[in-house]
Amino acid sequence: MINKVLFMLVTFSFIFAETASINGKVQYEGKVPRAKKLNMAADPICGKAHTEPVFNESFLVNGDQFMENVIVWIDSPKHSSEVPSEPVVLDQVGCKYVPHVTGIMQGQELMIKNSDKTLHNIHSMSKVNSNFNFAMPAKSDPATKSFAKNEDPFYIKCDVHPWMKTWVVVLEHPYWAVTDADGNFSLDTDKLEPGTYDLCFWHEKWDKAMKGSGYCSDEYKTSVTIADKAVDAGTKIFKRPAKKK
């Protein structure tokens, strides 16, 4: 009897933990461009960090063309969430920024690490928040930064290694996610008020098109209604932006 009660409690807890969330996928429709190899010959330490070819991460899809590295966030949610105490970690590994794209809440710490045995330079290209530009030698202690204002996606680069780039979006809330290698995303909506919200989708290859039409314009958003349960947002399709006439 006791075992049965424990089983029911564990099962109930598992179901409860899975409830308040938004889940979905992102897929590309069109011809997939050939992946480009990165040339790291300028710094031998970078090349020696890899035993296999390294490819540009600006456009990654799997065999079914589900897209990796799409940032998904909720537009202007009604929430009571505090700034997370855990920092967002940005590392430099094998002369690449990890992760390639990320979100962060305004006021939340960004912890920057250098796991490489070479010098890097961290140069933010923000247009709203204060920029930073500093060197980070090998074996440096982590550096921490934060952003005081919301900001559309911008990139951070390394002036020493021009192929290194990571993208950041600064939000007034923690409700964001990045698609994985199979195009999946999941947003925990535990502290959101029930209602209908817009999900915004962003990818760096569409950045110029989005600036023209506006971030979170009709083409790059999906409306979802949430409650105390898991919500399937379906599959968001990205098509190649039409060329301007």
Model regions: which residues?
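Short, Lys/Arg-enriched, disordered terminal segments
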Residues: M1-V5, K245
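Sec-dependent N-terminal signal peptides
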Residues: K4-S13
